[in-house]
From Swiss-Prot:
G2 as annotated region, ranges: 46-50
A GO cellular-component term linked to this record: plasma membrane
InterPro entries: G_AIG1, GIMA/IAN/Toc, P-loop_NTPase
Induction (UniProt): Up-regulated by brassinolide and heat treatment. Down-regulated by 2-aminoethoxyvinylglycine (AVG), high CO(2), isoxaben, and propiconazole treatments.
Gene name per UniProt: IAN5
Family (UniProt): Belongs to the TRAFAC class TrmE-Era-EngA-EngB-Septin-like GTPase superfamily. AIG1/Toc34/Toc159-like paraseptin GTPase family. IAN subfamily.
Segments of this protein annotated with the region G1: 20-27
GO MF, any single term: GTP binding
Keywords: GTP-binding, Nucleotide-binding
PROSITE patterns: G_AIG1 (PS51720)
Listed name of the protein: Immune-associated nucleotide-binding protein 5
Length: 301
């Protein structure tokens, strides 16, 4: 796959963009598609590379940074999406969502589809293919992709696969088997061709209405992020902390009052006991005095 001919500028090109969170193997997948190491791991900006496949197709692969990572700002995301589109003359022919069978589905993956639809428009699912990296992991376990998907497939993944018509493919980016390398690329390109046929040969973002839909998506995303930015971080947690602080303060005040009341009650009780004891002693003294006087009178008589 490394001895492919270089494409000419006049030949038709299929633009394939790789999206997904950082660490799922987008760059390695791009290298597998191109047939050589052209994309660096953990890229921080959109990169593109053209290549001619063994069957003569010209593909333009766009590797994107982790646009759906939770730490990515809206400004950065929009800038890179625009950058991505400038690298795709003729529109997008396929959007490949890259996931990994070696890691659990995280919040980034679950948020990816919503962000894709907001940024690229609702038509995105008509151009979507789900690509799973980590084929080497399943091979070691003697498992297939269907085996992996059947063992507790998350609802998010079921939804994505249903919306994109079940288009999926497994990649082993670590294999040295040339036959496997060619076969997995063929499988992905077969999905790309099916997408093209499904959409009547029309690519995404080739007409003004497509671009308008994308702009509307960008505006919605910006508005959503602006609203979120105005909210204090972890609002529920902060509110809970405030309530706990109030509750704790109230409890401490109540305890302090109880201690004070107890001490007062104890002091009052102690004082009452002393008065009672004093009264008892005085009464006993008076009684004894009366008895003593009575005895003296009896002796005189």
């Amino acid at each position: 796959m490394s001895d492919r001919a270089q494409p000419s500028a006049s030949e038709p090109v299929r633009n394939i963009v790789l999206v997904g969170p950082t660490g799922n193997g987008k760059s390695s997948t791009g290298n597998s598609l191109i047939g050589k190491e052209v994309f660096i791991l953990e890229t921080v900006e959109c990169k593109t590379c053209k290549a001619k496949t063994l069957d003569g197709q010209i593909i333009n692969v766009i590797d994107t940074p982790g646009l759906f990572d939770l730490s990515v700002s809206t400004d950065y995301m929009n800038k890179e999406i625009i950058n991505c589109l400038t690298l795709t003359d003729g529109g997008l022919h396929a959007v490949v969502l890259v996931l990994s069978v070696g890691t659990d589905i995280l919040k980034e993956e679950e948020a990816a589809l919503n962000k894709l639809q907001l940024l690229f428009g609702s038509k995105i699912v008509d151009y979507l293919v789900v690509l799973f990296t980590g084929g080497d992991v399943l091979e070691k376990e003697n498992k297939t992709l269907d085996d992996y998907l059947s063992r507790g497939c998350p609802e998010f993944l079921k939804t994505v696969l249903r919306l994109c018509g079940g288009r999926r493919v497994l990649f082993n980016n670590k294999t040295t088997d040339e036959v496997k390398k060619i076969e997995q690329v063929k499988q992905l390109l077969a999905h790309v061709e099916a997408i093209e046929n499904l959409n009547g040969g029309k690519a995404l973002f080739t007409e003004e209405n497509d671009l308008n839909e994308k702009r509307q998506g960008e505006m919605l995303m910006e508005q959503e992020m602006e609203v979120q930015s105005k909210k204090p971080e972890n609002t529920e947690v902060e509110e809970m902390k405030k309530q706990l602080e109030i509750s704790y303060g109230q409890q401490m005040n109540m305890m302090a009052q109880m201690v004070e009341d107890t001490l007062k009650e104890s002091s009052a009780s102690h004082e009452r006991m002393l008065l009672a004891l004093k009264d008892k002693v005085e009464r006993s003294y008076l009684e004894n005095e009366d008895m003593h006087n009575e005895t003296k009178r009896c002796n005189i008589l």
